[in-house]
Regions:
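N-terminal signal peptide c-region/cleavage motif recognized by signal peptidases
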Residues: 11-13
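Beta-propeller blade repeat segments, especially FG-GAP/WD-type strand-to-loop junctions
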Residues: 65-69, 115-133, 165-170
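Calcium-binding motifs, dominated by EF-hand helix-loop-helix domains
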Residues: 92-96
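Beta-propeller fold detector
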Residues: 75-78, 132-138, 175-183
């Protein structure tokens, strides 16, 4: 009896995990496939419109899968569920951790005035074939990476357009550097970034000295 129960458990377990997720002919929703590595067996799949869209709705629920396609079953390394706005060109690539590898950004939504865009960032590691999501990156408006100063530059469109600088902390969680500053006609952005980083470095050095006293 125990042997029968054990065999049933193994059968159910294999059925739960050994499934074909990618390239299903009758899968629910609209599927989008991204191949972040040279090895095309690794796939990032977005399952759009898993719930029927309500009239006039702009944001919808989607599943994102990252895994490896194999003949009999797919290995799913991780899965997440997010709300996002569906647009045609929703994938972009830009290096955000200064390792020379372009990372993957998935468009999530727009904010006020329609010009404020938000993204989910996944750091690409071609050696280990991993995609690592950066927590809270989708809170940074209109992000770009400044290679010279190694900072993330956010540009927000509000009543007064402004900049905010970020860097990655532990576990690649972004944190603010300095305070936001307005975009003016006389602004030299390069000099402004350099000045903020200089002040930040001086403050950090003083704090370390106080800690060791």
């Amino acid at each position: 009896m125990k042997l029968i129960l054990l065999l049933c458990f193994i059968s159910i377990t294999n059925y739960s995990f050994a499934q074909k997720i990618f390239h299903q002919q009758k899968a629910k929703g609209k599927w989008q496939y991204i191949y972040p590595f040279v090895d095309k067996s690794y796939i990032l799949a977005i399952q759009h419109l898993i719930i029927e869209r309500k009239p006039f709705a702009e944001i919808y629920n989607a599943n994102i899968y990252f895994g490896k396609s194999e003949p009999k079953a797919n290995k799913i390394f991780w899965k997440e569920n997010i709300d996002m706005r569906q647009i045609t060109h929703n994938i972009t690539y830009e290096d955000y951790n200064n390792d020379g590898i372009k990372d993957l950004l998935i468009f999530e939504d727009t904010g006020a005035r329609g010009g404020n865009s938000f993204y989910n960032l996944y750091l690409v590691n071609p050696k280990n074939h991993t995609l690592t999501k950066v927590k809270d990156f989708d809170k940074i408006v209109n992000p770009s990476y400044n290679k010279k100063h190694k900072v993330i530059v956010s540009y927000g469109l509000t009543g007064t357009n402004y900049y905010q600088l970020y860097r990655f902390g532990k576990k690649y969680k972004p944190y603010e550097i300095g305070k936001p500053f307005d975009d003016t006609d006389n602004l030299d952005l390069d000099k402004k970034i350099a000045a903020i980083l200089k002040i930040t470095k001086t403050t950090e050095q003083k704090n370390k000295q106080l800690t060791h006293q």
